[in-house]
UniProtKB/Swiss-Prot annotation:
Bias-annotated ranges (Basic and acidic residues): 145-170
This protein's encoding gene: MRPL2
Protein name: Large ribosomal subunit protein bL27m
Keyword presence, Repressor: no
Keywords recorded for this protein, A-Z: Mitochondrion, Ribonucleoprotein, Ribosomal protein, Transit peptide
Statement: the UniProt record of this protein carries the keyword Transit peptide: yes
Superkingdom per UniProt: Eukaryota
Entry-linked InterPro entries: Ribosomal_bL27, Ribosomal_bL27_CS, Ribosomal_bL27m_C
GO terms of biological process kind: mitochondrial cytochrome c oxidase assembly; translation
Disulfide bonds: none
Family, as annotated: Belongs to the bacterial ribosomal protein bL27 family.
Family matches, as Pfam families: Ribosomal_L27, Ribosomal_L27_C
Intracellular or extracellular location(s): Mitochondrion
Transit peptide: 1-34
Length: 394
């Protein structure tokens, strides 16, 4: 055996290890081509090539367009500032039209920045707590025909959706008209307000606004404050547009604030967004305690009949007493989908899972005493489900 073969065996003891070595070696040397200069080779026969023309391409105060190169460099000798971006080779270019500004940032005193000021009179950097100047790119159209054409312009997708959007808009308008009509009838028939026509319209609009705000999650108190703020703000805008004088604005503002304060103590909105009589906080607390006591004494730990369901539901939904979260809590407690096992009339012990009695539903529960899964039967009375009134509200 030659010396080369002996050395070969020492380096490659068996075919299995050789295959592992070759495979791992090939996995490590797989070349990934990238769009860089050294992808094809690494010969050094062009070390004397021409320079890359590095340096600034636009100077202080020069006007540049989007995409125009401001600085070519190797490394970040100059850092990108406002309204510019930096490329893979550290080239800084403009992303907005404006004027070049070279500056230092107080938060990075050793870095030099270049940015774009959108106006000639602006300097960089922008003060830290000041709003940044943004360019929206709009130009005023003076030709009426061109302006109307631009307003009516829409994309193809938007154009194809117009029938469906118009149908949805019409449905919403019909719902708002029906709601306004219901509120108008309620104010006229249920409450003795003795309001003028103008004040009646103010009251109607206020109730509609408060109802919309409570439906989107605001509390009744926040909705009342927001409704007052919106009305006063609209008056302020009308005054700024010259539609009324400052004296008229002050008079209307004071009148509405006094009107809202008096009206909110007579009529308010319940948890379902419908008009109801105002209840003072003291009376509301007293009614809540009375209703809760009645529910606990008469409807706890017993079978609930259909008549009991309606009674419990009416007590919980008493207008102006509970908010939505309180009503949800009380319904989960006194009108659960399944009665608790503490209601002994609905529990059947020692039931055969394979042959349960008629009208008994087999279920498994965790026994707290034995710490084991227990098989019991529940009668149909244990499953309350939703009331018809609750389904109508859902």
């Amino acid at each position: 055996m030659s010396f080369i073969k002996q050395v070969g065996k020492l380096i490659r003891p068996n075919d299995y290890s050789s295959s592992i070595f070759q495979t791992s070696f090939l996995n490590n040397v797989i070349q990934v081509r990238t769009a860089t200069k050294r992808a094809a080779g690494s010969k050094t026969n062009k070390n004397d090539s021409a320079g890359r023309r590095l340096g600034p391409k636009a100077y202080e105060g020069h006007f540049v367009k989007p995409g125009q190169i401001i600085m070519r460099q190797r490394g970040t000798k100059i850092h990108p500032g406002e309204n510019v971006d930096i490329g893979k080779d550290h080239t800084i270019f403009a992303i907005e039209p404006g004027y070049v500004r070279f500056y230092y940032d107080p938060f990075h005193p050793l870095r030099k920045y270049v940015g774009i000021a959108l106006r000639k009179d602006l300097n960089l950097p922008t003060p830290h707590f000041s709003p940044r100047v943004r360019r929206f790119g709009y130009e005023k159209i003076t030709d009426p025909a061109e302006a109307e054409k631009e307003e009516n312009h829409m994309s193809r997708k938007e154009f194809l959706q117009q029938p469906e959007l118009e149908k949805t808009r019409q449905e919403q308008q019909n719902q708002e008209e029906q709601r306004a009509s219901a509120f108008r009838n309620a104010l006229s028939s249920q409450f003795n307000l003795d309001l003028s026509e103008a004040d009646f319209q103010l009251a109607l609009n206020r109730l509609l606004n408060i109802s919309q705000l409570t439906n989107v999650g605001q509390t009744l108190e926040d909705a009342e404050v927001q409704s007052t703020y919106n009305y006063v703000f609209d008056l302020k805008l009308s005054c700024k547009r010259g539609e009324m004088t400052s004296e008229e604005f002050s008079n209307l503002k004071m009148h509405y604030i006094q009107f809202a304060e008096n009206f909110d103590k007579k009529v308010t909105i319940d948890a379902q967004g419908n008009p109801c009589t105002y209840v003072t906080p003291e009376a509301k607390k007293e009614n809540q305690n009375e209703i809760l006591s009645k529910l606990e004494n008469e409807f706890s730990n017993r079978v609930i009949s259909e008549k009991d369901k309606e009674t419990i539901f009416d007590l919980i939904m008493t207008p102006g007493i509970y908010n939505l979260s309180q009503q949800s809590y009380l319904k989960d407690r006194f009108l659960p989908s399944v009665l608790p096992t503490t209601v002994k009339e609905t529990v059947v012990e020692d039931v055969d899972p394979k042959k349960p009695p008629k009208g008994v539903i087999v279920t498994r529960i965790f026994d707290e005493e034995t710490k084991q899964i227990k098989v019991i039967g529940r009668t149909k009375e244990a499953y309350i489900g939703q009331t018809d009134l609750d389904k109508s509200l859902a």
